[in-house]
């Protein structure tokens, strides 16, 4: 009986040693490979893909008027109830939002508001840096939503960290620089 236990104990010991050796080999393989950490925000910034859903913004029509007709469909379809719209009628009889606020602290950035809008007035942009120390600062009003930039048609790379200070958006470099970490992730 003890002889069988000794054989089983040796076999279990070798199995654990093999697992330990595999784990150490993987660790040493990553230790001597090139790092995948980006030096953010000082040296490099990430350009989101064109389908990325970041901050919200409101669109204007050709005459410079807000496209929103205050139908409140975006507020009704929102799963987290973070959109508040208060309508009014202007002097021409057009329905416009007197108050349009989005609480980005509660928002899921699902894009349902963008899909539900019949006037194509609300969209999700590509800005991903809007952190704050207070949740009250994350409630964005109508005027701020109108001032935000729209979507870029390119993206998905790493560029040098340069900002256009007038619009607070990234200026794309002539060619993306930096380490393309996504291409070099090891997959089994």
UniProtKB/Swiss-Prot annotation:
Binding site for [4Fe-4S] cluster 1: 68, 71, 74, 117
Reactions performed catalytically: a quinone + NADH + 5 H(+)(in) = a quinol + NAD(+) + 4 H(+)(out)
Database matches in NCBIfam families: NuoI (TIGR01971)
Chief location category: membrane
Keyword terms: 4Fe-4S, Cell inner membrane, Cell membrane, Iron, Iron-sulfur, Membrane, Metal-binding, NAD, Plasmid, Quinone, Repeat, Translocase, Ubiquinone
Membrane topology, from the record: Peripheral membrane protein
Cofactor note: Binds 2 [4Fe-4S] clusters per subunit.
Binding of [4Fe-4S] cluster 2, residues: 78, 107, 110, 113
This enzyme's EC code(s): 7.1.1.-
Record bears the keyword Cell inner membrane: yes
Gene Ontology cellular-component terms listed: plasma membrane
Residue stretches spanning the membrane: none
Name of the protein: NADH-quinone oxidoreductase subunit I 2
Domain 4Fe-4S ferredoxin-type intervals: 56-88, 98-127
Family that this chain belongs to: Belongs to the complex I 23 kDa subunit family.
Annotated organism of origin: Rhizobium meliloti (strain 1021) (Ensifer meliloti)
GO molecular function, one term: 4 iron, 4 sulfur cluster binding
Needed co-factor(s): [4Fe-4S] cluster
Biological role stated in the UniProt entry: NDH-1 shuttles electrons from NADH, via FMN and iron-sulfur (Fe-S) centers, to quinones in the respiratory chain. The immediate electron acceptor for the enzyme in this species is believed to be ubiquinone. Couples the redox reaction to proton translocation (for every two electrons transferred, four hydrogen ions are translocated across the cytoplasmic membrane), and thus conserves the redox energy in a proton gradient.
Subunit field text: NDH-1 is composed of 14 different subunits. Subunits NuoA, H, J, K, L, M, N constitute the membrane sector of the complex.
């Amino acid at each position: 009986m003890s002889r069988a236990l000794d054989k089983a104990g040796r076999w279990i010991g070798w199995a654990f040693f093999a697992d330990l050796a595999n784990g150490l080999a993987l660790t040493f393989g990553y230790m001597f490979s090139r790092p995948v950490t980006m030096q953010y925000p000082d040296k490099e910034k990430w350009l989101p893909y064109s389908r990325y859903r970041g901050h919200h913004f409101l669109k204007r029509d050709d005459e410079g008027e807000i496209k929103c007709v205050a139908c409140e469909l975006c507020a009704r379809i929102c799963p987290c109830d973070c959109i508040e719209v208060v309508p009014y009628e202007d002097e021409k009889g057009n329905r416009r939002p007197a108050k349009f606020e989005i609480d980005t602290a509660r928002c899921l950035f699902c894009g349902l508001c963008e899909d539900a809008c019949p006037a194509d007035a609300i969209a999700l942009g590509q800005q991903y840096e809007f952190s704050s120390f207070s949740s009250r600062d994350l409630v964005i009003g109508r005027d701020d939503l109108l001032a935000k930039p729209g979507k870029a048609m390119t993206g998905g790379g790493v560029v040098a960290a340069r900002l256009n200070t007038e619009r607070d958006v990234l200026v794309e470099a002539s060619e993306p620089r930096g380490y393309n970490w996504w291409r070099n992730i090891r997959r089994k």
